[in-house]
Design a protein with these regions (language model features):
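Active-site anion-handling motifs in enzyme catalytic cores
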Residues: 1-295
Length: 295
């Protein structure tokens, strides 16, 4: 059965789509790092704009949550790629239990058998061309396939900049983060290097004063408040700099949305470059893409 990618939804169209799901959904967020927290916040903010109430089920709660026959919205992200397996495991659970399942914009590599098993009760969003091409070949079980921007573009950045961290259990250690970026911005000349140091790192030179902010800013996602707390640390840290150089996709997205000058490097596969082409390669933001070094 051939799959037709029927549309790419603009942000307003995504909100309208979410509104069509009804007055209430069950929301399953990403696990991961501060970039994933920003995706989760974008999902929640879009649901709020759509007038849809939601129950938040952290991934530790999913296996026992009463989701049978209900409408479930799964956060987007980059977890359906090697070497990660958590997103695939939860997608396998949710496709069997949910009455209707919406998977918000993802990057996908592999997982052909899982994709082939997605039936007509599933709507699956890709966030860039390679994923949509892969879904067109692999999601042959009747799922609806759509395209849309990464959900971090739906996060209310102004709300995060005004977030009261003291209302959400912020420790003294975490509050010290506000001193470090201001000091670092002086030492590093108002320029932040935020290259990743994990499995998706490349051979790009990493400066001595590098801060892998997606890991550094993380302080939990067990409930909506902790997601917003993590995201608030994340965007406030970035807001202390004028120029950000990174190969972390959501450092790049958040920095662009803050109006910063961004040098966005590729990661270890196509993800960053493909999302840049889909959503950041325009005149409205100051983002320059730098391909990853050849291996």
């Amino acid at each position: 059965m051939a799959v037709v990618v029927t549309a790419w939804l603009a942000p307003g169209e995504m909100v309208s789509f979410l509104s069509s799901l009804g007055p209430h959904v069950d929301f399953v967020p990403n696990a991961g790092n501060a970039g994933d927290a920003l995706i989760n916040v974008g999902c929640m903010d879009a649901l709020e704009r759509a007038g849809v109430e939601f129950t938040y089920w952290s991934q530790s709660q999913v296996e026992t949550a009463p989701l049978g026959g209900r409408t479930v919205v799964m956060a987007g992200g980059g977890g359906l790629v090697p070497p990660y397996d958590t997103t695939a495991r939860f997608l396998s659970i949710l496709k069997e239990r949910a009455g209707r399942l919406v998977v918000l914009p993802q990057t996908v590599v592999g997982h052909e058998a899982l994709l082939a098993g997605l039936g007509p009760s599933v709507t699956f969003f890709g966030r860039e061309r390679p994923t949509l091409e892969h879904l067109a070949k692999s999601a042959v079980g009747g799922a609806q396939v759509l395209g849309a921007d990464d959900m971090a573009f739906h996060a209310d950045i102004g709300r995060l900049l005004g977030f009261r961290v003291s209302d959400h259990g912020a420790s003294i250690e975490r509050l010290r983060m506000w001193a470090e970026p201001r000091l670092l911005s002086v030492v590093a000349g108002d320029r932040l290097s935020a290259f990743r140091l994990d499995a998706e790192r490349t051979s790009v030179h990493v400066p001595h004063l590098n801060r892998d902010l997606s890991s550094l800013a993380f302080c939990g996602m067990e409930n909506p408040g902790r997601c917003r707390l993590t995201s608030a640390y994340f965007v406030r840290y970035l807001d202390c700099f004028r120029t950000i150089e990174t190969n972390r996709l959501h450092v790049g997205i958040a920095s662009a949305r803050l109006g910063k000058r961004v040098l966005l490097h590729g990661n270890s596969f196509f993800k960053v470059g493909a999302v840049y082409e889909a959503s950041l390669a325009g005149p409205d933001v100051d983002v320059t893409y730098v391909p990853a070094p050849e291996r």
